[in-house]
Every structure is written in C-alpha cells, then in structure tokens.
Amino acid sequence: MALTLTDVKRIAHLARLEMADADAEHMLGQLNEFFGLVEQMQAVDTAGIAPLAHPIEQIQEVAQRLRDDAVTEVVNRDDNQRPAPAVQDGLYLVPKVIE
C-alpha cells in the first residue's frame, strides 16, 4: 500500500490540520516507509509460532517484575461519595453538558 500526496493532504484536511506542501511531501515519505515496514511484518510466516501474552515470559534470565494482584483496602462507596455534590443510587450526578 502506497499513499499519494493527494491522500496525505486529504487525511490532513479530515484531521483539520494545516499542512504546507513541503510538510505533506515529507509526511508522505514517512508514511510510505511505515506502511512498507508493516507490509514486511505481514509477510513473515508466523503459522507455527504461539502468541505471547508478554514477551518477557520467554526470557528465563529476566525475573518477572509482575506480581499477583492483592486487595489491600476495601472501597466504601458511601465514604467516597459523601463529599460529592450530588449522588443517586450509588452514581455521581453531573450537570448536563450536551443538549
């Protein structure tokens, strides 16, 4: 997939970005390099490779810095909502901002 200068300008317009022609050409080169890298990664055959939940789990010499989650304190909803200006049925009431 290769973008054109028209594509870059259209994307900038949709994102409401002002972009000079020189900047658009520079961005075109960077985006096409990125998409080229993505195409190279997609071409790699990964059929026999199991997915990793975390890449460090495959390195035996590196100690896991992850620990099991443990409850350290109980959250009391009433205590947390006491300073709120308005609550109802355990939910915070906020002013309407979109009509």
Curated annotation (Swiss-Prot):
Lineage top rank: taxon: Bacteria
Catalytic activity: L-glutamyl-tRNA(Gln) + L-glutamine + ATP + H2O = L-glutaminyl-tRNA(Gln) + L-glutamate + ADP + phosphate + H(+); L-aspartyl-tRNA(Asn) + L-glutamine + ATP + H2O = L-asparaginyl-tRNA(Asn) + L-glutamate + ADP + phosphate + 2 H(+)
GO biological process, one term: glutaminyl-tRNAGln biosynthesis via transamidation
Assigned EC number: 6.3.5.-
SUPFAM superfamilies assigned to the protein according to its UniProt record, in alphabetical order: Glu-tRNAGln amidotransferase C subunit (SSF141000)
Record-linked Gene3D superfamilies: Glu-tRNAGln amidotransferase C subunit, N-terminal domain
Keywords assigned: ATP-binding, Ligase, Nucleotide-binding, Protein biosynthesis
Pfam families: GatC
GO molecular function, one term: glutaminyl-tRNA synthase (glutamine-hydrolyzing) activity
Subunit structure: Heterotrimer of A, B and C subunits.
UniProt xrefs under HAMAP family: GatC (MF_00122)
Family affiliation: Belongs to the GatC family.
Function: Allows the formation of correctly charged Asn-tRNA(Asn) or Gln-tRNA(Gln) through the transamidation of misacylated Asp-tRNA(Asn) or Glu-tRNA(Gln) in organisms which lack either or both of asparaginyl-tRNA or glutaminyl-tRNA synthetases. The reaction takes place in the presence of glutamine and ATP through an activated phospho-Asp-tRNA(Asn) or phospho-Glu-tRNA(Gln).
NCBIfam families, per the entry: gatC
Name the UniProt record assigns to this protein: Aspartyl/glutamyl-tRNA(Asn/Gln) amidotransferase subunit C
Provenance organism: Burkholderia cenocepacia (strain HI2424)
Lineage summary: Bacteria, Pseudomonadati, Pseudomonadota, Betaproteobacteria, Burkholderiales
